[in-house]
């Protein structure tokens, strides 16, 4: 980025509040399975795709989600409690099946 006549690095703008249609599209294309486990939701993706899905989850700003951890093909979604994990799991299952509103 050029600023004040000098070239330098800049962080990308933070995109917040991913629209539900974007979340649904990413989940339809990249998610293989979703499973609640206590206060976690475990999401499986094809190899190398977990980070892509994790970014969209982080941008979704769901209040039930405390945070995400992404590996190569697995995402752990930490929820605020087991009830919240069930809510998030149901919402993400709906996104994966194209029924998210």
Locations of regions flagged by a protein language model:
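Minor-groove-contacting beta-hairpin "wing" of winged helix-turn-helix DNA-binding domains
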Residues: 5-12
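Non-DNA-binding regulatory cores of transcription-related proteins
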Residues: 16-95
